[in-house]
């Protein structure tokens, strides 16, 4: 099988970086982009000065200000961010047409057949980083690896403004030392369960056969086994278009009843609406839906055509979904189906 060359590009605190670029007086101080604290706003992103205080994306603005009283929160300018992402996308297309956007500030590139720099993925990543910095005056981090799973981990390895390369002959050594918490799809709850089983690294995970992992984790067990062996055959999807947008959260302690679930709704909806604003204009929000996973891992999803996307509609959906199991809940999700105005035959031009 032909060896692939995948690059994962991730802009460094993208929204905040653009705000600091356009207004240098904002630099060198704790800065966040997000909603107002007195309106239950949520942090979309923040700079590294703010992160030093523990401020993080998806955190409520009110909590962020408690952690960092000097934090300046500015309103997002999504049209500006979309414009910059289009320019970055244009730089990508100088090297390959195989581009899978993940968000306004993140994308996979398959440069396996790119003739640039004699086919060197490392040199291509270096040039992309140089051009973004020179032309747009922001920084991006890049990861280069034989597959998407490793390229994404690599891009985070030397953030901010870094480049990390995992060559094919380095994959095995790199993966065996990798903490399982770094694996895609492993959140806090799954990581805690793995730790209880004595699994802290991918080397530990390799001691388990595929069947045993499936017994413990269901279908995700097979995915864990493959990732622990550095295997990820997912292709870079050029025509990847969203069918829906959702936000979900797994809780450290099960939510005992419907009322405790309803209390979690406003924060979930705030985060979902923030993500909706980041979509490009070729999508139109459609049917709202909720997802409920009960403590015994059974789950249900409920959607309603024609319903609005306000709090009351989601409360009604959640109440109906919860009644299907009427058990303690470990995960809640809210989302909306998306209508693709552009059509599936058209190539993506913006980061979605």
From Swiss-Prot:
EC number: 2.7.7.7
Cofactor: Mg(2+)
Annotated localization: Cytoplasm
Gene Ontology MF, one: DNA-directed DNA polymerase activity
Annotated binding of Mg(2+), by residue: 10, 105
Alphabetical list of InterPro entries matching this protein: DNA/RNA_pol_sf (IPR043502), DNA_pol_Y-fam_lit_finger_sf (IPR036775), DNA_pol_Y-fam_little_finger (IPR017961), DNA_polymerase-Y (IPR050116), DNApol_IV (IPR022880), IMS_HHH_1 (IPR053848), Rev_trsase/Diguanyl_cyclase (IPR043128), UmuC (IPR001126)
Pfam families (UniProt xref): IMS, IMS_C, IMS_HHH_1
GO biological process: DNA-templated DNA replication; error-prone translesion synthesis; SOS response
GO CC terms: cytosol
Site annotation Substrate discrimination: residues: 15
Gene: dinB
Matching CDD domains: PolY_Pol_IV_kappa (cd03586)
Domain UmuC stretches: 6-187
PANTHER family: DNA POLYMERASE KAPPA (PTHR11076:SF33), DNA REPAIR POLYMERASE UMUC / TRANSFERASE FAMILY MEMBER (PTHR11076)
Record function comment: Poorly processive, error-prone DNA polymerase involved in untargeted mutagenesis. Copies undamaged DNA at stalled replication forks, which arise in vivo from mismatched or misaligned primer ends. These misaligned primers can be extended by PolIV. Exhibits no 3'-5' exonuclease (proofreading) activity. May be involved in translesional synthesis, in conjunction with the beta clamp from PolIII.
Organism in which the protein naturally occurs: Ectopseudomonas mendocina (strain ymp) (Pseudomonas mendocina)
Quaternary state and interactors: Monomer.
Protein name as it appears in the record: DNA polymerase IV
